[in-house]
Amino acid sequence: MTDRHILTPAEGISSDGYITDQDCFSSVRYRGMRADINGCGWIAAYNLRHALGQEADWDEVRQEMDAMHTLRFPGPTLMRIMRSYLAKYVPDYRETAGREEAAQAAKESFAGIFRYQEGHEPHFISFVRQPDGRFRFFNVTDGLEDCVMPMSRFQEEHLIRGHVIALTVSEDGADREESSRGTT
């Protein structure tokens, strides 16, 4: 029998404060489940606030979003909860639906969140523009926990099935938030 290393939340956070690996949150509960299974929504919301330079504690974000779900049964973050949470903390965000439209809005943004299907699973991820024009993506999938690529490549490789929604913040909105650009 071999000892299996249990991942901890600290291991899932980058040196510049982004949550990069949802798998490290198996000891944390969200909506009655282990957050490594259904935590992508609150993780994306935390990362977006972090990208905008807002003071946010990941556990407080998780607890607040969990409490916003009035129906107390296990499941993922609902879009209405994500919208309500962002309206409170990121009031200048813009929602765009449709694969091409969402990708274009994201390409023109400073930072944001995608709601899409990764494989066959609904998923939220966050992203932030880098100084060279590419984007840094967080918590995409195993092997792509923290990666930098052009938005067009992300679109070609990940926004390929199902409904896509982009929740984006423009450069102007980011400037008002006293942005920290989160470079690698």
Language-model regions: role of each:
Residues R94-R136:
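Active-site-adjacent substructure of cysteine-protease-like catalytic cores
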Residues G12, D23-C24, T96, E101-A102, ...:
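Intrinsic disorder/low-complexity segments enriched in polar/small residues
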Residues E60-E101, E108-S109, Y116:
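Papain-like cysteine protease catalytic cores
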Residues I6, A10, D23, G75-T77, ...:
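Generic low-complexity segments that are intrinsically disordered, proline-rich and/or Lys/Arg-biased
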Residues N47, E118-G119, D142-E145:
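Solvent-exposed loop/turn segments at secondary-structure junctions
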Residues V128-T184:
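Noncatalytic regulatory segments and standalone regulatory/sensor domains
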Residues M1-L71:
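Active-site-adjacent structural segments surrounding the nucleophilic cysteine of cysteine proteases
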